[in-house]
Amino acid sequence: MVGNPVQLCSPITQNGTYTLNEAFSNYKLIYIVMFKDSNIYASIFQEALLGAGYKANISQAGYNLQLTFSGTSVTAVINGASSVRIFGLN
């Protein structure tokens, strides 16, 4: 059973590096929600499966998002999304 999600940083609205409230590796699952207009796209990644450099790449309906996690920060490259939220789940 999965616990309650914890938002790991303020909403991401532009390219850049954001500070996480705590290390993403403290969570088994990383839940990423991407918003554009009235559409919501969500993806769940296992922390251990984010891959080399801890990258998450999401492409949905012409919207692209690349997140690179490192300790207590995340670097975002957003193309088309208006807002992104990142949650940790155990």
Placement of each model-derived feature along the sequence:
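A signal for long, low-complexity, Ser/Thr/Asn-enriched, surface-exposed stalk/shaft
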Residues: 1-4
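Surface-exposed ligand/attachment interfaces on beta-rich extracellular proteins
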Residues: 7-27, 36-42
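Nucleic-acid endonuclease domains
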Residues: 17-19, 61-66, 80
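Short, surface-exposed terminal/edge motifs of secreted or surface/virion proteins that either
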Residues: 38-52
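Contiguous ligand/interfacial binding patches
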Residues: 49-66
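Noncatalytic modules at the cell exterior or secretory-pathway interfaces
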Residues: 68-77
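Short, structured beta-strand segments at or near domain termini in extracellular proteins/domains
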Residues: 79-90
